[in-house]
Amino acid sequence: MDRFFIRQEISQSTFIENQEDVKHISKVLRLRVNDKIEVVDSNEKEYLCEIIAISKDRVEYKVIEEVAIKRELGVQIKVYQGVPKGQKLDLIAQKLTEIGVYSIIPVEFKRCVSSIKEEKEDKKIARLQRIIYEAAKQSKRNHIPKIESPMTFKELVKELKSNTINIVFYECEEENNLKSYFASLDLSKVESIGVIVGPEGGITPEEIELLESNGCKVLTL
């Protein structure tokens, strides 16, 4: 069954008005009156709905029932991704959305060979957010991850304190691995996890040292 998001609470809206979604419903999926859809509202609650009218600019529905299924992870995972070359961030954003991350933040590390140019940032972020939106629908998410504006490494270090724990994957780490580290945690007390992933060229030893000195756990897969 196809899923759609609305920006209001379900009690305040009985319409899908996102024009891309309206076109997708009527022209691509060719849904009709009485067809069922899934609607997720601004509170990230999921509802089974029935289409009752389709016009050029909106789709009207009625709520059949709330769907009480836990779709999201019990912890917010924020991925700080080193800016990769080319269009790789498109695929990264799509796959991270599909596996349940909460938000994605591009980071400019020293060894990044690419960057998101300031004059193209808004357009790039908007395109990535559209990719995330479609991936959230396809993977039955109730939360649409947000792709944040790129940050510098210094900004990343300051950001670490906003998370319960932070981890970084480093190719030179040989002892501490992801599985054993998470086995040692009481995840019921963890609200958010910052996951730091470097660019193709890796993270410099100096960056790793600074991350570790600010409480980040250095791990190998």
Spans of model-derived segments:
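Structured adenosyl-cofactor binding patch, chiefly the S-adenosyl-L-methionine
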Residues: 204-221
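Short amphipathic alpha-helix with an adjacent loop that forms part of the alpha/beta core around
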Residues: 156-162, 179-188
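RNA substrate-binding interface of SAM-dependent RNA methyltransferases
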Residues: 70-168
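N-terminal positively charged helical leader segments and presequences
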Residues: 1-68
